[in-house]
């Protein structure tokens, strides 16, 4: 049987400033085996183990100013220990059109006891832009 923590956001968008990696926060816990979720933004394994980490997110639809043809970049990544010695992994830079596509990424990496993991997002649009929907899941079969 799997041990799983799952965080979810869909009711209130999270506004993300441009050119700054921002830790996603979530609105609720869907599943919280072994009390692994922290502050509605992090999953912290209680024991070492192999984990399957997944994230699913959607940026709000974007409207560009007339004549603005500059390409935009919208990225996401998993981040270990975001408030301490930061270690990012599983970064994704998909050619997405915000609001018209979903980004789903799964990455297998070690879950260390007491080491929190989160999801960060980044964009280079000229103004803050919202993430409308996000899910973050950590799953292990090691305990």
Indicate where each model-derived feature is located.
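Extracellular jelly-roll beta-sandwich "head" domains, especially the C-terminal globular C1q domain
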Residues: 1-143
């Amino acid at each position: 049987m799997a041990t799983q923590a799952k965080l979810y956001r869909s009711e209130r968008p999270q506004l993300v400033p441009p050119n700054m990696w921002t830790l996603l926060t979530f609105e609720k816990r869907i599943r919280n085996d072994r009390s692994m979720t922290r502050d509605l933004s992090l999953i912290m394994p209680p024991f070492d183990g192999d984990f399957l980490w997944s994230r699913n997110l959607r940026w709000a639809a974007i409207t560009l100013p007339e004549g603005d043809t500059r390409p935009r970049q919208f990225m996401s990544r998993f981040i270990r220990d975001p408030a301490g010695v930061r270690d990012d992994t599983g970064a994704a830079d998909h050619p997405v059109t915000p609001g018209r596509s979903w980004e789903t990424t799964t990455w297998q990496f070690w879950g260390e006891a007491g080491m929190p993991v989160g999801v960060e997002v980044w964009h280079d649009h000229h103004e803050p832009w919202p993430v409308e929907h996000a899910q973050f899941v950590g799953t292990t079969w090691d305990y």
